[in-house]
Amino acid sequence: THLGQEELEVFHYHRAITNTNWKLFVDNNSELYHEFLHVLNRRTAVAHKSYHERNWLLYQNSHNIIQQGVIHYDSYGLGERSEGALPGMQPNGMVVMLLFPDVMLNIRATVMRIDTMTPLAPGKTLVEWRGVGLKSDTPDVRAMRIQHHNEVWGPAGRNLPEDIAAVETQWETMVQGGSRYSLFAREEGLKPQDDANLRAFYQEWGRCLGRAPNDPFRHGNVDTDVSHSIKEITNV
């Protein structure tokens, strides 16, 4: 359980219209092997054994969560996040929750980020980011949360500009014909870089739209009953 019954409060908001397809930003927020893109993530997470000892938990309708892990901020010269943790979070903990179709909740111990994506056109996506703390925060605690938020996120943070560059480059290569397909073939026993959550997303996307994710422009009857192919769902 995370956050409990505490009231939340948004303290940061910014948005951007990105030159990419909506699904690519959803993919970026969902798959964890893209963490190799971020220097901060490589040093503080991927390089450590504990990062790889977590599992994805997959739920019906493609709502997913990655088990909480510990981030080693000292590996990047950043301070510990051991005080003022949000309810349900351990010191230096991190957890990511994905709500179908396009909402991500990312908690880094003391602060939460909420992403929402809105498709505007095939190559235009509105992305909105919110930094969230507790409504009960004292001024000192709120200042701490803002600092921790801006160390990694925010328009001038370390990660978001890299995410935007990645998804816009992906879209450009697709439009120009350099990359016709996206492959979601990793099977790692539901470990962090398993593609099971992405496969679940596209199975649910296909069910909702009545289209086969691997051939969306096919005419005629399309089998959108994916219950026979989802073998990785967590029973709840």
What function would you assign to each model-found segment?
Residues 1-236:
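C-terminal catalytic domain of Rieske-type non-heme iron oxygenases
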